[in-house]
From Swiss-Prot:
It comes from Mycobacterium sp. (strain KMS). Residues 1-243 are annotated as: Pyrophosphorylase. Pfam families: Hexapep (PF00132), NTP_transf_3 (PF12804). Homotrimer. Residues 265-497 are annotated as: N-acetyltransferase. Its cofactor is Mg(2+). The active site is at 376 (proton acceptor). SUPFAM superfamilies: Nucleotide-diphospho-sugar transferases, Trimeric LpxA-like enzymes. This is Bifunctional protein GlmU. Catalyzes the last two sequential reactions in the de novo biosynthetic pathway for UDP-N-acetylglucosamine (UDP-GlcNAc). The C-terminal domain catalyzes the transfer of acetyl group from acetyl coenzyme A to glucosamine-1-phosphate (GlcN-1-P) to produce N-acetylglucosamine-1-phosphate (GlcNAc-1-P), which is converted into UDP-GlcNAc by the transfer of uridine 5-monophosphate (from uridine 5-triphosphate), a reaction catalyzed by the N-terminal domain. InterPro entries: Bifunctional_GlmU (IPR005882), GlmU-like (IPR050065), GlmU_C_LbH (IPR038009), Hexapep (IPR001451), MobA-like_NTP_Trfase (IPR025877), Nucleotide-diphossugar_trans (IPR029044), Trimer_LpxA-like_sf (IPR011004). Its EC number is 2.7.7.23, 2.3.1.157. The gene is glmU.
Amino acid sequence: MTSSTTSSTDTAVLVLAAGAGTRMRSDIPKVLHTLGGRSMLAHALHTVAKVAPQHLVVVLGHDRERIAPAVEALATDLGRPIDVAIQDQQLGTGHAAECGLAALPEDFTGVVVVTAGDVPLLDADTMADLLATHGSAAATVLTTTVDDPTGYGRILRTQDNEVTSIVEQADASPSQRAIREVNAGVYAFDITALRSALRRLRSDNAQHELYLTDVIAIFRQDGLSVRARHVDDSALVAGVNDRVQLAALGAELNRRIVTAHQRAGVTVIDPGSTWIDVDVTIGRDTVIRPGTQLLGRTRVGGRCDVGPDTTLSDVTVGDGASVVRTHGSESLIGAGATVGPFTYLRPGTALGAEGKLGAFVETKNATIGAGTKVPHLTYVGDADIGEHSNIGASSVFVNYDGETKNRTTIGSHVRTGSDTMFVAPVTVGDGAYTGAGTVIRRNVPPGALAVSAGSQRNIEGWVVRKRPGSAAARAAERASGEAAEQALGHHDDSQGS
C-alpha cells in the first residue's frame, strides 16, 4: 500500500446508496443484499471506517426508511458517527453527490471521496492508494480494465495518456464502446472544484440525468489536474446490479476468505464447497471438511475438526473440538468436545469441555457440563446438566406444558437410563440414577435410584386371540408349536434316562 499524503482528518467520504436497484428484482433494497455475512452497504462502510475519514455521509433515496436503521446500526457497530443525506428525487449520480456535500460542514475544505454502496470488495488499501495518488489534483478516478466493459463508463485518454473524460455506456460511440478501461465509480475530489463543477452539470444525455462523471471533462476544460489510479484487480471495484453479479462477487469474496485462512494455517479440504463469512475466525491447524459453512461471527479454535456437511452460525468452538454433520446457531462448544453426527444445536446451547452430543441429539437453551455425554436420540431443552453425567438414549426433556417453558436441572455424575422423560420443572440430584423408561415428575434426591415403571405383566396368547390369521399370529403359533415340541422332546429324553 502506498502511504497517503492526505490526512484522514482532512477527508470526507460520500457513500452513494440512493438508487432503486430495479435489476435486482427484489423487495429488499439492493444495498441490503448480503454476501460473506454482511450487506453490501456494511462492506462499504467497514472499508471506509478503516480509512478513518473526518466525515462519513451515506446518501439515501429509494427505500430510505428501510436503509436508515441499518446505517444507524452500523454506526454503533463501527463506533463512529455516520451522517445521512437524502436524495428525494433520483436525478443522477451528480445530484446524489450534491446532496451528500450538503451534509458536510460549510467550512470543510479537504478531499471528498465518493464511492458507492454496491461495491462490496473495495478495500481500504485501494482507497488509501486513491488518496495517495490524488495529492492536490482536482480529481482522481479509480479505473480498471475488464474483458467485457458493457454497462461501464469508458475512460477516454489523450495520446499522452491523460484522462480527458468519462463517457457512459448509453452515450458512447461504437469506437468508445470498444475501450476496455472503465470507470470504477470511486473518486477523490478537491471539494471546491467539485462544488463548482456540480453547478455546471447538464442532463442533456441519453438518460436525462446529472452524471457525476461529467465533472471530469469540466475540470479538464478549466485546466485543472485530473489523475487516474488503475486497479489491476478488477474484482475489487466491481459493482453489483443483479443477482448474477451478486452471486459471482459472493463466490469471489468467499474464495479470497478461504485462501486467507489457508495461508494462516487452516486446512480446508475442499475450498469449492466451503463457505466462510468475513467475520469468522479460525485457529491454526484446524481442519475444515467439505460442505462446511461457517457463518456470522463464528469463532473456531485451533486444532479443531469441523465437518463434513456442517453449518455453524454465531457458534464458538473451543480448541481441539470435533464437530461432524451438525447444524448449530448461537451456541458454545467447549474445548475438546465432540458433536455429531446429525446434531442440532439451537440458540442458547453451551456444551462444556470434553463433553459429547452424539447422533440425532437436539439441544436448545441448555447448559451441559464438562465431560457430560448425551450420546444419541435425545432432546435437551431448557435444561442445566452438571459435569460428567450420562444421559441415556431416547431421553426427552419435557419442557413445555402448552403455556410456559420450564427448566430441568440435572446434577453432576448422574446416570439416566434410556427413554427417561424429565417433566419440567424437576431436579435430579448429584450422583442419582434413573431406570430405563422412567418418567421423572418429582425431584430425585442425590444418590437415589428413580424408577417409575410398574412390574411387567405378560398376557399369554393375546395376539392369537385378538389378531387371528395375522402374520404375527401365525408366527406366534409356529413359535408356540416349536416350543411345545422341544419341551416334549426334552420330557421323552428325561423319561428314557
